[in-house]
Amino acid sequence: MSDIINKFDLKKLSPRDACLWKEWKELDSLCAKRKAAAANPREPSISYIIRKKNAMGLPTEYEIWYRVKSIVGVKGTTPPREPIFGNLHKMSIVLPNNYPSADGNPIFTFRTDIWHPNIRFSGSFKGHVCLNSKDMGVMASLKSLVLRVEQYLKYQDYHAQNTYPYPEDQNVAEWVREEAEPNGWTRFPQDEKTPPQPADPGNSGNGTDGKASVETPIKNNKILTI
């Protein structure tokens, strides 16, 4: 994929297309590094598919695959509701026509269930990812946002308190504060053999609240290895 990316003549690209090219190159480079570090090269921790391109052949819509352990739901309807874990999560990224600009932020939406206070679990906006953060500006790179979502999935980063910028899903946030943190469920290892660690009593509801983040290039919507 890097060969395809490098064939573009940057002098012939508009400012927007040059930005799309740069974002693509950074994402692809991140993917290559993750693939090289993976125990199974066919299953890197993050991979991508290009779902849509513009007239210049530059990506305007991606599908990101995360292969990490994360919470995808809870058991039962009454407390204590233990977490249900999954290991493959798919998220779409749509870059609007006015991207990049303050009013043209990328739209991140999970296509698989994710149980996280900053990701909508149900309803008409199901899967929507809230990336508001005081330490990341509106012009944060696509690569940095993809890594931020990886931190979300691992529960290394979350905002469950009912304070600005407010949780995206209040039901999940309440579960985090009242059930998950007291039971240590927000601190789960990626290694299945390692038991969960108890929560820090002094950090309840503040996982940055909890803070401690790629992929495979594609051709014709098929994941390639490099």
What is each stretch, according to the model?
Residues 95:
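Short, conserved beta-strand/beta-arch hydrophobic-aromatic motifs that form part
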Residues 1-88, 98-226:
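UBC/E2-like fold recognition across ubiquitin and ubiquitin-like conjugation systems
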